[in-house]
Regions:
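Pocket-lining segment of extracytoplasmic ligand-binding domains
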Residues: 88, 176-268
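Short, glycine-/small- and polar/acidic-enriched structural segments
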Residues: 25-163, 169-172, 188-191, 218
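Bacterial N-terminal signal peptides that target proteins for export
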Residues: 1-9
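Cleavable N-terminal signal peptides
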Residues: 11-12, 22, 54
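Conserved C-terminal helix/tail region of periplasmic/extracytoplasmic solute-binding proteins
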Residues: 303-335
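Sec/Tat signal peptide C-region and signal peptidase I cleavage site
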Residues: 18-24
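Secondary-structure end/capping motifs
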Residues: 232-313
């Protein structure tokens, strides 16, 4: 091969490589969410300038689901890249849905973390119920049997010697209807969370008997998960996404941006801004770790409690399913 021919060949290879890189499509990352603003996924990049890698290395596609089990199904069939799961759903994804390669990659919200808001279990002020033991023979409302808040309820009552069905009755009601369920006498105790717990009438006529933190300590309510194979093939794009997401979360948490942040949420949820002003992005809200770090000790305690209550049949080591190195790398970029 002559020198000229060799140079032409090298130039051709370089040109082809550069063309391939230039035409490479950004990685589509579909991310599931269930409830906003607990999950910020649908509004994460509503503020221009936060998603600096969006459209280059990745494209984020928020996908709404009515409940966590639907995300697990979507993940199983390859229709979702990131599932926002919690302590009460993650073990089922790993143990029952065949997602042994599912990894915990970033935090979303914690109940009771850093002395922030914890879910309230409330009774009427004139009910005569002063202690958990007074719930014997009563009707208790939860948003769903088997949910995290139901598990906390069971744990707290069991601590006082009360067993489900034997000592009390559980009914189901959506969170928005809980106030009416309590005040109309359909249940003696309800579960209430943000924003419903701040309803003026509920605050005036009911009181907190205990919180979820009282029942089980800090709870890992929601965290991002992804499959190991996808992360291995698309590590750079995932780190870019996590960098942008941390930048966005920090922007939302900054008191200087609170008015604009509330306006974004209000527009998305079609609610008046006043509905959020007393609690969102404050101590009255669930804790959001600005570095995206999952509290693995809390998560392990949550999972162990599930085992003790017989909700899951085998032990699960949360740390063996955690891959927090990506979010750690993303956080380092923002320093």
């Amino acid at each position: 091969m002559t020198r000229l021919t060799m140079n032409i060949a090298i130039a051709t290879v370089i040109a082809a490589t550069l063309a391939g890189q230039a035409s490479a499509e950004p990685v589509k990352i579909r991310a599931g969410w269930v409830v906003a603003p607990a999950s910020l996924i649908p509004v994460l990049f509503a503020k221009p300038g936060l998603a600096r890698h969006q459209g280059n290395s990745y494209v984020l596609e928020p996908v709404y689901f009515s409940a966590s089990p639907a995300q697990i199904t979507a993940m199983s069939v390859g229709e979702l890249e990131i599932a926002a799961l919690g302590f009460s759903s993650f073990p089922f994804a790993v143990q029952n849905a065949g997602l042994a390669d599912l990894r915990i990659i970033a935090d979303e919200i914690q109940d009771g973390g850093k002395d922030n808001f914890s879910t309230h279990y409330m009774v009427k002020k004139d009910s005569g119920i002063a202690t958990v033991a007074d719930l014997k023979g009563k009707v208790l409302a939860t948003n769903g049997v088997g949910t995290g808040v139901h598990m906390a309820m069971r744990a707290m009552l069991q601590r006082s010697g009360l067993q489900d069905k034997r000592d009390y009755t559980v009914i189901e009601a959506p969170f928005p209807t809980m106030k009416a369920v309590l005040l109309d006498g359909k249940a003696d105790m309800i579960v209430s969370t943000t924003p419903f717990v701040f309803d003026p009438e509920l605050q005036a006529r009911a009181r907190v008997l205990f919180t979820q933190r009282d029942a089980m300590g800090t709870s890992e309510l929601s965290f991002w998960t992804a499959r190991e194979g996808f992360m291995g093939k698309n590590r750079a794009a995932m780190v870019d996404l996590l960098e942008d997401s941390l930048r966005a979360v920090r922007w939302y948490l900054d008191p200087a941006n609170r008015t604009e942040a509330i306006d974004i949420l209000a527009r998305f949820l079609k609610q008046p801004p006043a509905r959020f002003e007393s609690w969102i992005f404050s101590k009255n809200d669930f804790y959001r770790n600005p570095d995206g770090l999952v509290n693995l000790d809390a998560l392990q305690n949550n999972i162990d409690l599930m085992r003790q209550l017989g909700i899951i049949s085998t032990d699960l080591d949360a740390r063996k399913h955690a891959s927090l190195d990506l979010v750690g790398e993303a956080a380092q970029r923002l320093k």
